[in-house]
Structures are given as structure tokens and as C-alpha cells.
From Swiss-Prot:
It comes from Cecembia lonarensis (strain CCUG 58316 / KCTC 22772 / LW9). Its EC number is 2.7.7.-. The keyword Transferase applies. The keyword Nucleotide-binding applies. A motif (Pyrimidine specificity motif (R/Q)xW in donor pocket) lies at residues 275-277. Gene3D superfamilies: Beta Polymerase, domain 2. UTP acceptor binds at residues 51, 123, 169, 276. Residues 7-19 have a biased composition (Polar residues). Belongs to the CD-NTase family. E02 subfamily. This is Cyclic dipyrimidine nucleotide synthase CdnE.
């Protein structure tokens, strides 16, 4: 007999309560206000939007911090095809730097929330939680363009960690693709993602040997790569969960089976480019999860 009942699994597919959702929305609103009311930043073209599990509506009760992207658009970083120069595409440079921008965002948050409430970290600037808001990770980014030979480009975001590492992401494509898959699976994609995330926390709470490489983001991307039929063709969460684990286990036994898997944005490979996780990590985790569930 399985460890959890169908009712338990069903309850874990649901989003946070209304009161938790209100706290999340308060956090996003206050970050917007901090940026728009800042004397220096208010004169620049900046877009503030949610990203990560909050924006994708895949957060679970134990993971109710949020990521807010604060994107600068008066300049952009870019990657060009080989043998092309920025002059070929009419790109002009700006004297304003990413480092200056992150400092300016930090100052705006300190002015809004107070120095004691704001902590600068390697990848983000964290606003501490209180009774009104949840902990909020503010990620200052710039527009980023990945050019093709013909001059067309894919637009994303780029930022530099305080340790000097550049990271590019495609949060808007991630959100759009997640919505599309959710619509094509009777809203089961996001529910199954929440279920996988919740079970990871349950395993950790139970003292399970869960690798730090198995992140909430990775789990969402793994569910993204599960075929829609697994969410659509089975009638219970017990069976959908079971079949998703079987699929992920079978297709991560050999690297060749999953080497083309992408993130939800489908603009970055899931297992390429020096990721902290490997397909072997995922395969081992699926065994651990299966045994935890007592299937």
C-alpha cells in the first residue's frame, strides 16, 4: 500500500492559501514602489515582474519566498554569432554598468525598507519577511539578446553575481510555456509540479538523503519534460505521480535519452553547460522518491 492516500496527494497539488497569496502580492507591490519612487531609477526604463515558482504559480506552502526580476532596458548585453561584430548589428554601448545598476537597486530597497531589512547576496538582494510580506529575493537584471546570423534575436535577461559569474535566463518564455502546457493538461502540469516539490520537502523532513543538486527549479523542468499524456490519460494523482516517476527514471538511465531536454523556456538545455545537477542525480533521486512513496 502506498505511503500517502489519494486525498493527501490531491491536497499537495493545490496552491498556497489566499492569505499566503496576499503576502506574496504585497511583496511584489512594495518592490515596484521602491523602484518607481527612487530618484535615480525612476528616470530609467525598468520593468519589474515576478519570476520563479511564485510567478509560475508552482509554489508550495513550504516555499513561499518569491523572486522579483528588476530589469533594466535602456541598454542590453548580447551574444553574437561567430565572425560577427556589434557594428554588423548596429549595437551601441552604454557607459552605465551592471555593477552600478545593482548598487542603485540596493540603495532604492534600503531607502524603502531600511538597511536592517535588506541583505545583499551573491545573486540577489533579499528583503526580509515580516507579518505583511514574505521574504523577497530581488534580482537586478539587464535586457539580454542572443543574436542569430540574420540579425534576429531571442530576448532574455542577464545578470552578474558578486563573485563575477554571468548568468542568462529567459523568465518570460518560461512563464508562457508553463501556461501553455498547463492549459494542455487540464491544469495538471502545475499541480504535478507542486506535488513533486512538496514530496521533496517531505523527504527532507523525514531525514531522507536528498541531494542538494535536486532543486525546486530542476523539479519543475523535469515535470515539463514529462509527456502530456501522462497527465491526461490517468485518473488519479497517485497514478499520475507514479507514471511520471517511471518516465523520468527510465529516461535518465542513459544520458542519450535526455540530452535534448530543455528548461521550461526551451532556450537552455537542462543537462548541458556545467549545471550543478546531472541526469545521474535525477535517476538516483527518482529511486529515492519511489522508495519513499512505498510504491
Amino acid at each position: 500500500m502506498a505511503k500517502y492516500t489519494e486525498d493527501q496527494l490531491t491536497s499537495w497539488t493545490k496552491p498556497p492559501s489566499d492569505s499566503e497569496q496576499t503576502k506574496l502580492e504585497n511583496s511584489e507591490k512594495m518592490v515596484r514602489e521602491a523602484i518607481s519612487s527612487d530618484e535615480k531609477l525612476s528616470k530609467k526604463t525598468i520593468e519589474t515582474f515576478g519570476q520563479g515558482s511564485y510567478a509560475n504559480n508552482t509554489n508550495v506552502r513550504l516555499n513561499s519566498d518569491i523572486d522579483i526580476n528588476v530589469k533594466y532596458s535602456d541598454g542590453f548585453y548580447f551574444d553574437l554569432p561567430k565572425d560577427k561584430s556589434r557594428e554588423d548589428f548596429g549595437i551601441t554601448l552604454t557607459s552605465y554598468s551592471y555593477e552600478e545598476y545593482k548598487d542603485d537597486v540596493e540603495n532604492a530597497l534600503v531607502n524603502k525598507f531600511g538597511r536592517s531589512e535588506v541583505v545583499r547576496k551573491d545573486k540577489c538582494i533579499t528583503v526580509k519577511e515580516n507579518s505583511y510580506r514574505v521574504e523577497t529575493d530581488v534580482v537586478p537584471t539587464w535586457d539580454y539578446r542572443r543574436y542569430s546570423e540574420n540579425g534576429n534575436y531571442v530576448q532574455g535577461t542577464k545578470f552578474k553575481t558578486d563573485k563575477g559569474i554571468w548568468i542568462d535566463n529567459y523568465p518570460k518564455q518560461h512563464i508562457a510555456n508553463g501556461i501553455s502546457k498547463n492549459n494542455n493538461t487540464a491544469r495538471r502540469f502545475k499541480r504535478l509540479t507542486r506535488l513533486h516539490r512538496k514530496l521533496r520537502y517531505k523527504m527532507i523532513d523525514d531525514g531522507g538523503n536528498v541531494s542538494d543538486n535536486i532543486t525546486s527549479f530542476l523539479l519543475e523542468c523535469l515535470v515539463w519534460n514529462v509527456p502530456n499524456r501522462i497527465m491526461n490519460d490517468y485518473d488519479t494523482w497517485t497514478e499520475r505521480l507514479k507514471q511520471s516517476i517511471i518516465y523520468l527514471y527510465n529516461n535518465t538511465r542513459e544520458e542519450s535519452s535526455c540530452k535534448e531536454w530543455g528548461e521550461v523556456s526551451e532556450l537552455l538545455y537542462l543537462f548541458h553547460g556545467g549545471r550543478k545537477w546531472t541526469s545521474k542525480d535525477v535517476n538516483s533521486y527518482m529511486v529515492l522518491l519511489w522508495n519513499h512513496l512505498e510504491f
